[in-house]
Regions:
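N-terminal beta-strand-loop-alpha-helix module at the start
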Residues: 2-47
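Structural motif
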Residues: 5, 97-98
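Short Gly/Thr/Asp-enriched flexible loops that form oxyanion-binding sites at enzyme active sites
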Residues: 107-125
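Electrostatically charged, flexible surface regions
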Residues: 132-249
Length: 249
């Protein structure tokens, strides 16, 4: 048994298909594998709208499931998403040793979010992991897919890993009756922008307006002229045009 803790970064696809429905829970399955094989407990984290789909995290044995949901954070790109997730991880009371994500997103193969999380946390990142070969209290050993080869690497903790869609689970990973029963007494924990420090939130959404849940960046802001000022402006422009015409004559 290792005195370690893992975190699964979960994001369900906007539109579920036969191809991506199972892939999105690969981080869950990986963390359950860690729990069954090494007795490493884990939590789940997502930046998305609340959905009952996330209750599946508890079915797989997660201790806690956090969903960061706030209108201030809606519509964020991958870089800002990674920054928010990383800030939550760094500000939480738990030190995670292994942070697990997945290679695919709604837009195809990407490592932008997990690599961004690793970058903001200033910790190692292993991309496109195909197999977990070994794990000790000090290091993680795995194989990742290069464009033409499979490379075996090792990393110290903490580390962020991104699972390839060809990841090889040693056996079928599924919810246990024990975890499913306990899941009934667990609730998804909603995290709002109030959790984060004010200066961080302001750095994420500088000069923005929120209209119908969408963020609009303010490029320039000025007051509308009054009717009186508008008439004066029109008079000035008219006189200027007359002077220009006179000078041309």
């Amino acid at each position: 048994d290792y005195n370690m803790r893992a975190l699964a970064l979960i994001r369900f696809p906007i539109e579920k298909t036969v191809d991506n429905e199972d892939f999105c829970i690969y981080p869950l399955k990986f963390c359950k594998l860690l729990k069954e094989k090494y007795n490493i407990n884990f939590d789940c984290l997502s930046l998305s709208k609340y959905s009952s789909n996330y209750s599946i995290c508890y079915d797989y044995g997660a201790d806690k499931t956090y969903i960061i949901e706030d209108v201030k954070f809606s519509g964020m790109d991958t870089n800002m998403t990674a920054k928010i997730l990383a800030n939550f991880i760094s500000e939480s009371d738990i030190n995670y040793d292994i942070i697990v994500s997945f290679i695919l997103s709604d837009y195809g193969e990407t490592a932008h979010v997990p690599s961004g999380v690793a970058s903001y946390l200033n910790i190692p990142f292993v991309y496109a992991v195909k197999q977990l070969t070994d794990l000790t209290e000090k290091e993680l050993f795995c194989k990742y897919i290069n464009p033409s080869t499979v490379v075996e690497v090792r990393s110290t903790y903490p580390v962020v890993i991104s699972l390839h869609y060809q990841f090889e689970f040693p056996y079928n990973i599924a919810p246990s009756l024990f975890d499913v029963y306990n899941a009934k007494n667990k609730e998804i924990i909603n995290i709002s922008s109030a959790f984060f420090k004010r200066d961080f939130v302001e750095s994420i959404i500088p000069k923005t307006q929120i209209i119908d849940g969408k963020i609009n960046t303010i490029i320039k802001q000025s007051s509308l002229p009054s009717k009186k000022n508008a008439n004066i402006q029109e008079t000035i422009e008219m006189l200027s045009n007359l002077i220009l015409k006179r000078d041309k004559l």
